[in-house]
A protein has these predicted regions:
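Glycine/charge-rich catalytic "coupling/switch" loops of P-loop NTPases
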Residues: 232, 259-309, 334-357
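Conserved ABC transporter NBD signature motif
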Residues: 61-73
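ABC ATPase nucleotide-binding domain
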Residues: 3, 28, 64, 344-346
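The feature captures the beta-strand-to-loop junction immediately N-terminal to the Walker
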Residues: 38-40
Length: 357
C-alpha cells in the first residue's frame, strides 16, 4: 500500500520566484494495484514519483509505504532512498554497459547481507519473470532496447520492493515493441501482485495498463478514477480534452423534459443524461460516439458537412461542421465519407456527458 497526502514541492524560477511543481497532491494505491500519473510534460508527475522514491525532498506533505511513514514534513523526517523498499525503473533504463545482465540485475543486492547463493537465486527468478533467463551472462551492450527495458525491470524487482515506481519506461521503444511491452508489463504486475506507480504522458498507455488513473496538470491532481471512469465520465474539461480528444461543447438553457435533460448547443437542441444537482456548462462528446444516420426522425440528429477526412487504416478521422462549430468524429472505413459530403449524425443522449467547467 502507498499513501501520499498533501504533497508539495517548489522549485526556484527566474528572479527569485518559485514554481509549484507539485501542489497539494494526495492519492492512495491499494496493495497489488497499479496507479498511473498521467499528464503533459511539466505537470509534476515525475517530481511526485521521485519524491516517493526519496530522490526529491518535498516541501510539505506525507508519504507512507506499507505501515511505515517514509516522509513527513511536519515531523521533519525523511527516510533515505535505500531504506524505502521501493524499486525504480528510469526512462533511460540506466543499464551499465561494462556489466553483464547478471551483474546489472544483482547490483541492488551488493553490500546487503544476502548470500551469493541467494543473490544468484533471486537474479535467476526475476530474469525468468521477464523472460531473460537465457541472457544471464550476456554483456549489456549486446542487448536490444526491449531487452534493456526488461533488465531494468528485473533489477527493480530483485530486492523485493513493496512499491515499484516506473518513470515512462516504454517511451524509448518503437511503437510496435512499446505496445507488446505494455501488455507484458501489465501481465507481470498482475501475476506477481505488485503495487506500482507508473508515470506517462501517453493516454492510451495509461488506459491500457492501469487500475487507477490520476490526471495531473500544472502540479495539481485534476481527476482520479478507473480508466473507464476517466474516459467515459470525465468531470473536468482538461481530462476530457487530454484523454481521447473529446469534443467539449458549450451548453445553455438546460431544462428537464419528460425525465430527460435538454439544452441548447451552437447548432441546435440536444438531449443528454444528467443526474447531478449542478447546472452543466459544457458537454463532452467523444469522436467515436458520433454516428452517421440516414434521417433525422429521432432526438440528437443534426445535419453536418464533412470538412476534413484523414485515413488512419481502421478508421476515418474526420472534422465535421455543425453550425458554427467543428467537431472531431471517427467513422469506420465502411462509412466511405468524403470531403464536402453532407450527412446526418446522431449521438445517443447517454454519450453526451455533462461537465461543470
Amino acid at each position: 500500500m502507498l499513501r501520499v497526502t498533501g504533497l508539495k514541492k517548489q522549485f526556484e524560477a527566474d528572479r527569485g520566484a518559485s514554481v509549484a511543481a507539485v501542489d497539494n497532491v494526495s492519492f492512495e494505491v491499494e496493495t497489488g494495484k497499479l496507479l498511473t500519473l498521467l499528464g503533459p510534460s511539466g505537470c509534476g508527475k515525475t517530481t511526485t514519483l521521485r519524491s516517493i522514491a526519496g530522490l526529491e525532498e518535498p516541501d510539505g506533505g506525507e508519504i507512507q509505504i506499507g505501515s511505515s511513514v517514509v516522509f513527513s514534513a511536519t515531523r521533519r523526517f525523511s527516510l533515505p532512498p535505500n531504506r524505502r523498499r521501493v524499486g525504480m525503473v528510469f526512462q533511460s533504463y540506466a543499464i551499465w554497459p561494462h556489466m553483464t545482465v547478471f551483474q546489472n540485475v544483482a547490483y541492488p543486492l551488493e553490500g546487503s547481507r544476502v548470500s551469493k547463493i541467494e543473490v544468484r537465486k533471486r537474479v535467476e527468478q526475476v530474469l525468468a519473470l521477464v523472460g531473460l533467463e537465457a541472457f544471464i551472462e550476456r554483456p549489456a551492450p549486446l542487448l536490444s532496447g526491449g531487452q534493456q527495458q526488461r533488465v531494468a525491470l528485473a533489477r527493480a524487482l530483485v530486492a523485493e520492493p513493496e512499491v515499484l515506481l516506473l518513470d515512462e519506461p516504454l517511451s524509448n521503444l518503437d511503437a510496435q515493441l512499446r505496445e507488446q511491452m505494455r501488455v507484458d508489463l501489465r501481465a507481470l504486475q498482475q501475476r506477481v501482485g505488485l503495487t506500482a506507480v507508473y508515470v506517462t504522458h501517453d493516454q492510451i498507455e495509461a488506459l491500457a495498463i492501469s487500475d487507477v488513473v490520476a490526471v495531473m496538470s500544472a502540479g495539481r491532481l485534476v481527476e482520479i478514477g478507473t480508466p473507464h471512469q476517466i474516459y467515459d465520465w470525465p468531470k473536468s474539461r482538461f481530462a476530457a480534452e487530454f484523454i481521447g480528444a473529446g469534443n467539449v461543447v458549450p451548453v445553455r438553457e438546460t431544462q428537464s423534459v419528460d425525465g430527460k435533460s435538454r439544452g441548447r448547443v451552437p447548432w441546435g437542441e440536444i438531449y443528454f443524461s444528467h443526474n447531478g444537482q449542478t447546472i452543466p456548462k459544457a458537454l463532452v462528446i467523444r469522436p467515436e460516439d458520433i454516428q452517421i444516420v440516414s434521417c433525422s426522425t429521432k432526438d440528437n440528429v443534426w445535419p453536418a458537412k464533412v470538412d476534413q477526412v484523414v485515413f488512419l487504416g481502421a478508421i476515418y478521422d474526420c472534422r465535421l461542421a455543425l453550425g458554427d462549430m467543428t467537431l472531431r468524429a471517427q467513422f469506420p472505413r465502411s462509412a466511405g465519407v468524403e470531403v464536402g459530403q453532407l450527412i446526418h449524425v446522431h449521438v445517443h443522449e447517454t454519450r453526451c456527458v455533462p461537465i461543470e467547467e
